[in-house]
Structure formats: C-alpha cells, structure tokens
Amino acid sequence: MRIRDMMTKNPITVDSETLVIDAQKIMKENDIRRLPVVDKGKLQGIITKHDLLEASPSPATSLSVHELNYLLSKMKVKEIMKKNPLTLTPDTPFEEALRIGQDKRIGSFPVVENGKLVGIATESDIVRFLTRALGIREEGSRITIEGLGGKLTDLEKIISIVNQHNTIVLSMISLPRPE
C-alpha cells in the first residue's frame, strides 16, 4: 500500500502572502485543519488550525477589539506557517508514513512528486483508508482467530475453510502476539 492510494489529491492551498484571516475562512468553509502553503508551484510550508490559534491574541490582552482586528487583518500566512515540513512521495509505503507520523507526532504530510505538491496525507485520510481496507462499512461477519503460530500452513488452513463455505474474505489482518 502506497500513500498515493490514500492521500487527498490536489489539496486546497494558499500562498505565503495570504492573510491569516483569509486562511481561517478557507479552513472553516472547507472543514479542513491544514493548508499547504505553495508559491509558484513550490511547497513553502504548512499552516494548521493550531498555528492559527497560537497566532491569535490572548483574551487577557490590553489591546482593544479594533486594534486586534487591525493586527490580524495584516498578518500573513508566511509569518506563522511551519516552513520546510516533512514530506512524503506518492510511492512512500503506507506503513512507513504511519511510523514516521507516530514517532514524530505529525498529523499530516504534504505529498510531493518532482518538486510539486500532488496531495496531502492526513489522519482523516488514514482512518478513511483503514476503514475501506478493513471492510468496516461492508456487510458480513467478522471472525477473530487467535493463537495461530504465524506459519503459512495456518493461513492455508483458514483459506481452505473459507473456500469450503463458499465465503468471500474482504479483509484479513494479522497482529503480533502480546508479550
């Protein structure tokens, strides 16, 4: 499984000169939490809802509402975006992306091919992909088989039983034994 199989292709983007207030509006209107920042076709960074919250003034500020609105209306994405985000290619194995995301606590990856942004892989994309891969929305029975030795002969036995009952396997997953 590769990232190309689960990423959001041609994601909504902004350029580095976009006003923060406009980026907030784009995120809200499209129900998204991240925006890649692209200038002249090249990825410059990424801005998240969290970045926008961090850039917002504290409620304890001594500035007036008008002063706050003025400051926010002038702030640009390039001032608060994360520059040079960790990226993936469309051919990155799904499992590797999952490992990197967990190890580095990253919730999304811009996907770049030949220097161009071609997609974004987010936590939501991963959940959607796993839901499809595991057949969660498909009708049928779920069977859990525990205690297998992990040998090919065990899998052959399972497939033989499934075939005897003229059943279709939509998905199969193997988990390591708990220590």
Predicted regions mapped to residue ranges:
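Tandem CBS (Bateman) regulatory domains
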Residues: 1-10, 49-86, 93-102, 122-163, ...
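The feature marks the first
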Residues: 3, 12-30, 36-37
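Short acidic-hydrophobic, aromatic-tinged amphipathic segments that line or gate anion-handling sites
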Residues: 14-15, 87-89
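A glycine-centered beta-loop-beta connector
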Residues: 27, 35-51, 101, 109-124
